[in-house]
Amino acid sequence: MVKIEIGSVGDSFSVASLKAYLSEFIATLLFVFAGVGSALAFAKLTSDAALDPAGLVAVAVAHAFALFVGVSIAANISGGHLNPAVTLGLAVGGNITVITGFFYWIAQCLGSIVACLLLVFVTNGESVPTHGVAAGLGAIEGVVMEIVVTFALVYTVYATAADPKKGSLGTIAPIAIGFIVGANILAAGPFSGGSMNPARSFGPAVVSGDFSQIWIYWVGPLVGGALAGLIYGDVFIGSYAPAPTTESYP
């Protein structure tokens, strides 16, 4: 059963919530700066050559490391979402209210935009690369690819961070989340770009002015995140029986 809670505006503007929004903004900014920056660096070093296997690995590793750090520095304040798809997936499982989640989205998208503006400034006007499906592939293939890889990401978030039975797994959650993002970029990068994150794609689209395929990177990740939240948050966690408070023995 879906456990979505709307919440209240008052709760969403509490001091703790405002701190969470700022945390999401900063962490997303740092993540996108490093992630998009790695793609810019590759283009600079190769004179805008096409992405080769070594470049793909470098970009994947940069995103994995940056997300590991971003989740780690925000986890104790906001939960370390850094991603509207993660926020939606957690909302479907009742881990965050819709209103608060909406403000998370705003903070994440603003962080991404500011990161890309900073990159343009510090690189003296270099063009920010945007996500797009590879030549020969259609939008539907791109959406399905993003659904699958984002499902894997949000499912990992649930298993290592949101599941009340996670135990010691919680200590490796940022590492596992970074690893799955890096692995998914290696798998999906040559085809859809492997975004898994509407905010990660939105910032470059805004700064470059190229919105031609941005809908793919909202629809795919949001559907994938919601499905992961529905399956893990509502089917698995929702089926947990409460632990008994007393035990009786013969």
From Swiss-Prot:
Question: Listed GO cellular component terms?
Answer: central vacuole; plant-type vacuole; plant-type vacuole membrane
Chain ranges sitting on the Vacuolar side read 46-53, 123-133, 190-210
Q: In which tissues is it expressed?
A: Expressed above groung and in roots.
N6,N6-dimethyllysine PTM sites in chain numbering:
K3
Q: Which SUPFAM superfamilies does its entry note?
A: Aquaporin-like
Coarse class of the primary localization is membrane
Q: Respond yes or no to whether keyword Amino-acid biosynthesis is given for this record.
A: no
Q: Which residues carry this modification: N-acetylmethionine?
A: M1
| TM ranges | 25-45, 54-74, 102-122, 134-154, 169-189, 211-231
Q: Where is this motif: NPA 1?
A: 83-85
Keywords tagged on the record: Acetylation, Membrane, Methylation, Phosphoprotein, Repeat, Transmembrane, Transmembrane helix, Transport, Vacuole
Phosphoserine: which positions carry it?
Answer: S248
Task: State the membrane topology.
Answer: Multi-pass membrane protein
Motif NPA 2 per record, residues: 197-199
Q: What is this protein called?
A: Probable aquaporin TIP2-2
| Source organism per UniProt | Arabidopsis thaliana
